[in-house]
Amino acid sequence: MGIHQNSPLIDAAEVRKLHALTGDALVAKQANDEALAKIIKGEDKRLLLVIGPCSSDNEEAVLDYAHRLAQLQEEVKDKIFIVMRVYTAKPRTNGDGYKGLIHQPDAEGDVDLLAGVKAVRHLQSRIIIETGLPIADEMLYPSNLDFFEDLLSYHAIGARSVEDQEHRFVASGIDVPTGFKNPTSGNLNVMFNGIYAAQNQQHFIFNGAEVKTDGNPLAHAILRGANNENGQNLVNYHYEDLVKALDKYSTFGLENPFILVDTNHDNSGKNFIEQVRIVREVLLNREWDERIADTVRGFMIESYLEDGRQDTPEIYGKSITDPCLGWAKTDSLIREIHDRL
């Protein structure tokens, strides 16, 4: 067998003792989880923003961003609830490239997954302790869930993972909101089948044991655009796309209809400045159609300190993966959203 064990077995219970939340930070985490659940259920009508860097590659830059975001959250909290993207594991189209903090605690260093697990917990706990913000990460590796679930208030299932049965079944055992992206093909049925699986009880083998889940009624849809066989972007944030998606909730008989629009990726063609225009169009459609306003109640936005991206981490606060909105544009956009709600 070509899989070689490079470390002793990792004890998840011991991992969770590293940078564990206590006191005020734990209370804040619990309050954020409760608020998020109410938003997904429609009991709290604030708009949800899941926003932050494409990848959390530099602890100090990410914390700098987090402190700015937390200050802005205080100013807009009457209409907007912010969850910070703290993405630490990155899917790669062909397996090459920077795979996130969990793989490389130093973005220019060697792969060290054990150090990466510690670095992820250190960063995510610092954000919660220092800012009180709830945080989101992509569940790229379901087997890693036990290492971080006590810190996360939101999980995302990516476009490349949404068809995978293990991702769907593990999501059915998560007790906080879990967003399912449409696959890169754009097939909405694939995404909604995933949400259906996650909202229902499942039985399977996980971490070496037979398990049964409760089902996750907070599983929901994220529209991120698509890419056809010729490499062309196919967007799904226009009026007719939103109507089709919200109709699927009835077709599949799902609980808590809720849709986030991912403003980057194939919706923007990774042209980061397009995120501003996409938000404006969706807000206009919410104003036009009450059904859209009731269901499309959030955005996922890629944002960092500096505009754009770079190949190597030379400029502080600039993405080394997908291009992001810089802070000045982010601040302006969030204030604009607040004013229009």
Spans of model-derived segments:
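Active-site-facing alpha/beta catalytic cores
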Residues: A66, K79-K244, K248, H265-K270, ...
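Conserved, mostly hydrophobic/aromatic
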Residues: G52, V261, G326
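Glycine-rich phosphate/diphosphate-binding loops that line cofactor/substrate pockets in enzymes
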Residues: A37-K45, T251-N256
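Short acidic, Gly/Ser-rich segments with clustered Asp/Glu that frequently serve as metal-coordination loops
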Residues: C54-D57, N256, N264-K270
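N- or domain-start disorder-to-order transition segments that initiate the globular core
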Residues: M1-K41
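Conserved phosphate/anionic-ligand binding catalytic regions in large, soluble enzymes, centered on
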Residues: L48-A61, D322
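Internal helix-turn-beta structural module
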Residues: S303-L341
